[in-house]
Amino acid sequence: MRALAYFGKGNIRFTNHLKEPHIVAPDELVIDIEWCGICGTDLHEYTDGPIFFPEDGHTHEISHNPLPQAMGHEMAGTVLEVGPGVKNLKVGDKVVVEPTGTCRDRYRWPLSPNVDKEWCAACKKGYYNICSYLGLCGAGVQSGGFAERVVMNESHCYKVPDFVPLDVAALIQPLAVCWHAIRVCEFKAGSTALIIGAGPIGLGTILALNAAGCKDIVVSEPAKVRRELAEKMGARVYDPTAHAAKESIDYLRSIADGGDGFDYTFDCSGLEVTLNAAIQCLTFRGTAVNLAMWGHHKIQFSPMDITLHERKYTGSMCYTHHDFEAVIEALEEGRIDIDRARHMITGRVNIEDGLDGAIMKLINEKESTIKIILTPNNHGELNREADNEKKEISELSSRKDQERLRESINEAKLRHT
């Protein structure tokens, strides 16, 4: 099977010979992949990993699967085959995948020495998104969506409405990350929010906050192209490089409703300066949420910035089925706009060119790229996109011609009056 696979730190490459996945457990299904987004975690696995992947020569604790594995966990596709225990999905359904691999999924790998291992405390209590052995389909547990096909159990698959294009459906997983953060902090409609960092998760948080009834959203982001995109998605924007950190914090607090800071802040950058800004830009009793993935290193912050104002600071990890279902419902109801969501996609590349044409581009050109999605192009997806772009350009040209014609007619009328 063709795939863009992880062989180890700094070693991602295309292969024609990845092992074809097959149904093992009765509730599994085969998904024909159309699109799969590249996540920041994928980039970190390349530059700093392995993080979720096992070390070379080792296997994953949940599945006992070794390297190499196809990367990619933001996937959308069509059901190709179903196991005898699949109840609610059928061949031909469009689906997205919740890619977590946890204690609850051990049964899928009956040959693993850990198949009967006791569940961790978090999984026992239903908090499987913070499983002690958490991995991802496409990042350690099993091969993911930078491949032609994936096998997944039905409980991790969600049907997508027919009107949602599969390139946008590939954004449902990162949007579920954002939705989970809003749920974790118990966001209240009518509140105000500051987002620090306008990468894919920061931009997705704009969409999730709008859907949740946020009154006012401000985004702090140094890159011009990302600020412009945040504006298109309905946020006010600020360039933090315009002033020193203290002046930026004072200014951001002043432009919040009431002039005394925001009800909620979302740190999507993961730097010492952004963590402290997220706390200090809160109003009293506000809540700061960390969505960023940090390295395991210590930083400095003042606990009294929290205590004196009875503020809260919390983390948010992954998602659960509630978040996938909520995002799909918001798309169905129009609370998340498909066209606005599609603004996040800045590139479409086939898996053969995924390393140089996408992963390295995201690493080296952060200011001009947001989200690149990959495809095995089994059904001419890239050709379809090219045809759609030509059609849009043609329609735009036609509209401009019509506008010019109307202007000429109006000018002629004015000359004869």
From Swiss-Prot:
Binding note for cofactor: Binds 2 Zn(2+) ions per subunit.
Listed GO CC annotations: cytoplasm; nucleus
Catalysed conversion reaction: (R)-acetoin + NAD(+) = diacetyl + NADH + H(+)
Chief location of this protein within or outside the cell: cytoplasm
UniProt-annotated binding residues for Zn(2+) 1: 39, 64, 173
Compartments, record wording: Cytoplasm; Nucleus
InterPro entries: ADH-like_C (IPR013149), ADH-like_N (IPR013154), ADH_Zn_CS (IPR002328), GroES-like_sf (IPR011032), NAD(P)-bd_dom_sf (IPR036291)
GO-annotated biological processes: butanediol biosynthetic process
Residues engaged in binding Zn(2+) 2: 120, 123, 131
Ubl conjugation in keyword set: no
Key words, A-Z: Cytoplasm, Metal-binding, NAD, Nucleus, Oxidoreductase, Phosphoprotein, Zinc
Biased composition (Basic and acidic residues): 381-417
E.C. no: 1.1.1.303
Induction: Expression is controlled by the PDR1 transcription factor and the glucose-responsive transcription factor RGT1.
Region (Disordered) residue spans: 380-417
Highest taxon in the source lineage: Eukaryota
Cofactor(s) demanded: Zn(2+)
Database matches in CDD domains: butanediol_DH_like
Molecular functions per Gene Ontology: (R,R)-butanediol dehydrogenase activity; diacetyl reductase ((R)-acetoin forming) (NAD+) activity; oxidoreductase activity, acting on the CH-OH group of donors, NAD or NADP as acceptor; zinc ion binding
Phosphoserine modified-residue sites: 63
Family, per entry: Belongs to the zinc-containing alcohol dehydrogenase family.
Additional free-text comment from the UniProt record: Present with 3090 molecules/cell in log phase SD medium.
Role summary: Catalyzes the irreversible reduction of 2,3-butanediol to (S)-acetoin in the presence of NADH.
Name used for this protein in its record: Probable diacetyl reductase [(R)-acetoin forming] 2
Species, as recorded: Saccharomyces cerevisiae (strain ATCC 204508 / S288c) (Baker's yeast)
Lineage of the species this protein comes from: Eukaryota, Fungi, Dikarya, Ascomycota, Saccharomycotina
